[in-house]
Amino acid sequence: MSAEPSGDPFVREMLAAALPCTLTSLDADGCPYSVVVWCALHGDRFTVNAGDGHWLANLRRDPRVSLAIVDTENILRHVAVQGTVVAIEPDPDYEHIDSLSQAYEGRRYQYSLPEDEPRFRVTIEPDRIRTLDFAPPGEAIR
């Protein structure tokens, strides 16, 4: 599949469902490091939000990432993204994390305050996207 997710209805459907995303970065020794994050689509780029921790340090050092978005009702429906971090920007007013929290939890982000924990909007340019939608029409596979 091309790396233009906004043109793919399945990718848009999966993101609109507010499914957990697994982001994998690379540690300094090359080992994969995975975390579960909230993600969104902005144009043809994916965005996630991060505190100033281990995996954000990984992204600053090596911008290669993968994202896996899996339907929690049917694991045979998923999106796999290989991409490159193209921007890491401060989210000083929590505008970005609040929008993700609204999508995933139906409320503003409540786990920290801007003055206590800086947050960062991470933008990922997809290089390759693969999808699997293995469900008979009108049926869920469990």
Give the role of each language-model region.
Residues 1-5, 76-142:
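Charged, gly/pro-rich active-site loop segments
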Residues 2-22:
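Short, basic/aromatic recognition patches
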Residues 18-51, 67-69, 78-80:
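Short beta-strand segments
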Residues 20, 64, 126:
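ATP/adenylate-binding site constellation spanning eukaryotic-like Ser/Thr protein kinases
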Residues 54:
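Short alpha-helical
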Residues 62, 67-70, 74:
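Conserved short loop/helix modules at catalytic or binding sites
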